[in-house]
Amino acid sequence: MGLPDASGDLSSEMEVDAFRRLFPLRYFERHLSESIRPDARPLGRARDTTLALGAVASAHGSALAKIGSTTMLAAIKMEVMTPSTESPDEGSIAIDFHMPPICSPIVRPGRPAEAAPVISKQLSDTISSSGMINLKELSLVSGKAAWMAYLDIYCLDADGALFDAALLSAVAAFSHLQIPIVSLNDDGKIELISEEDDGAKLEVEPVNKEKRKLTLSGIPFSLTCILHKNYILADPTAEEESIMETAVTVVLDSSSRLVSFYKPGGPVLAHTSAVQDCVALTRQRVKELQNILDETLSGMEID
């Protein structure tokens, strides 16, 4: 009995790889005809997803989210601000999405990634319209002091479905967030209580006596789908996004209420039946993500 032809196997692998690079769409369509993707996922299945809380020790709330290889690091810093005259009893949230060159070969040093401001706006609109955060919970002294929550999200690996992973990291960071203790000084100004003073007896009555968490409701989750001919691919990789142009992103909250629907472009119109299928896939995905978030929160040690 002869030995396996290793050179033949290697040659075959090289031919497949060459075909994939030269004719990427034909390569993918061969897999789609078998209802499978090159990474062995069924068309409607998302990639493995993980969450880690407290990833940034210096932040008031932080999380690391991974969907497949796509990786996002979210960190929240709280600062005291003067609220606007229009909303004297509300705080504010500022969101910035960053794509450093390390995240993708298409991002070049010195040139801001085109997707970054778009995703920043999508995140701001989604978190605002979902009603996840009651801005009144960020108020300290009516008309005088309120919290400004600065959320920065860094893309560490951009392998597709960036908005989905960014939103998940944002939701997880706000779930992990602990509002710092503050007090009024003799001049009537708000001061943060340092960690050293945290357990000490305060001469001035603190505005909030202990660290607290926000009450989150209607938490939004999203799923991006690629529409190609009669196929719908959930949670696309960067390679799939580059080959098949039409993408839609559905955002639902934890009660399956539609928060938003994004279709950034592409030549194919999203027909009603395709949209309904994407919404159905998103409902299933929301349950998965809610379970992942709940399990991560329950496994976290409370200080």
What are the functions of these language-model segments?
Residues 1-303:
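Polyanion-binding surfaces on beta-sheet-dominated domains and ring/shell assemblies
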